[in-house]
Swiss-Prot record:
It comes from the Archaea. This is Large ribosomal subunit protein uL3. Coiled coil: none annotated. One of its GO terms (biological process) is translation. Belongs to the universal ribosomal protein uL3 family. Part of the 50S ribosomal subunit. Forms a cluster with proteins L14 and L24e. One of the primary rRNA binding proteins, it binds directly near the 3'-end of the 23S rRNA, where it nucleates assembly of the 50S subunit. InterPro entries: L3_arc_euk, Ribosomal_L3_dom_3_arc_sf, Ribosomal_uL3, Ribosomal_uL3_arc, Ribosomal_uL3_CS, Transl_B-barrel_sf. Residues 1-31, 246-271 are annotated as: Disordered. NCBIfam families: L3_arch (TIGR03626), PRK04231.1 (NF003261). Keywords: Ribonucleoprotein, Ribosomal protein, RNA-binding, rRNA-binding.
């Protein structure tokens, strides 16, 4: 009998293909929600993962068996220093019916953020003297006129923002991360005025999110390197007896010799994949790091020195990794108030 008598489901999820390394450490969301807000606002933010802790809080989920009672809740800590918008990008529909960038406008105030030259080296030529700064204004001044004249064609606006890792000594990093964040709410004219008003200014996470709401988390998972089919796809290990002389931690066959099916489990890269986790609740947004720093600091990170947030449960990624926070595209529930926290664990994480 060369075949199996019992059927079993196919191992591995097709929704997670291809299982390859992410091309960028801080990915940009591919989908943005539509919010009903009269005032424009950013639809995302960027933070850096610190570690995990736990709190006791009053359960306020409706229809929960423990509603109104004190419950234990594991939380993930993220350090979220202010971000700085540097440029405005306008998207319009092209001949193929797809939105593409028609132009981008860089504010002269963006040159005050000196760390931008660590990411965009060509900008250092605009910082030599006043004459070079005037060339910068002349170069991008016409871009703003182009945006205003094509306002009826524009589908949406996005801001190119930079993080400030210099404010987090635990990272040991000075080069800012650049990422696009879409503007939602309001009309196109109001969105343009909002973007021009915030260019070159710091934006706090409190200007984007509030305590208690649900958000989505986009990032890159921990890298595991090269792995076999047992760990990579949870394939059932073959029996270990004398006739299985070619190994047990492998698949029985790859298929006919004409070619390997794409869904056949094979060894390869595991981890460091781009993933999105939906509906993570913000438990707390705080400005006082003493409220969350444990004795001795967080393992492999140190102490928090800036604004921080607590997210319900665990999230992807390793410590010190940039994490993109986005407005929930399909929130399961809309909370009106922030949860009531009764206790925050500040004991040492070092054993």
């Amino acid at each position: 009998m060369g075949h199996r008598k019992l059927a079993s489901p196919r191992r591995g999820s097709a929704g997670l293909r291809p299982r390859k390394r992410s091309s960028e450490l801080l990915p940009t969301p591919r989908t943005w929600p539509q919010i009903n807000s009269p005032n424009p606002k950013l639809l995302g933010f960027v933070g850096y993962k610190v570690g995990m802790s736990h709190v006791f809080m009053i359960d306020d989920w409706p229809n929960s068996p423990t509603n109104g009672k004190e419950i234990y809740m594991p939380v993930t800590v993220l350090e979220v220093p202010p971000i700085i918008p540097l440029a405005l990008r306008a998207y319009a529909v092209d001949g193929k019916g797809e939105p593409n960038v028609i132009t981008e406008y860089w504010s002269p105030s963006s040159l005050q953020f000196l760390d931008i030259t660590r990411r965009i080296h060509s900008f250092s030529s605009f910082l030599k003297n006043d004459e070079s700064k005037k060339k910068f204004e002349e170069k991008f001044g016409s871009k703003l006129d182009l945006i205003k004249s094509n306002l009826d064609r524009i589908v949406y606006f996005r801001l190119l923002v930079a993080t400030q890792p210099r404010k987090i000594p635990s990272l040991g990093k000075k080069v800012p991360d650049l990422v696009e964040i879409q503007i939602g709410g309001g009309e196109k004219k109001a969105q343009l005025d909002y973007a021009l008003n915030v260019l070159g200014k710091e934006i706090s996470i409190k200007d984007v999110f509030k305590e208690g709401q649900l958000i989505d988390v986009v990032g890159v998972t921990k890298g595991k390197g090269f792995a076999g089919v047992i760990k990579r796809y949870s394939v059932v290990e073959l029996p270990r007896w004398h006739k299985h002389r070619k190994g047990s931690r492998k698949i029985g066959t790859r298929g006919p010799s004409l070619g390997t099916p794409s869904y056949t489990p094979q060894p390869g890269q595991l981890g460091f994949h781009r993933r999105t986790e939906y509906n993570k609740r913000i438990i707390k947004i705080g400005d006082d790091p003493k409220e969350i720093n444990p004795a001795g600091g967080f393992v492999r990170y140190g102490i928090v020195r800036n604004t921080y947030i607590l997210l319900e449960g665990s999230i992807l990624g390793s410590k010190k990794r940039p994490i993109f926070l986005r407005e929930a595209v399909r929130p399961s529930y809309v909370f009106e108030n922030a949860p009531k926290i009764t206790y925050v664990n500040l004991l040492s994480k070092q054993g």
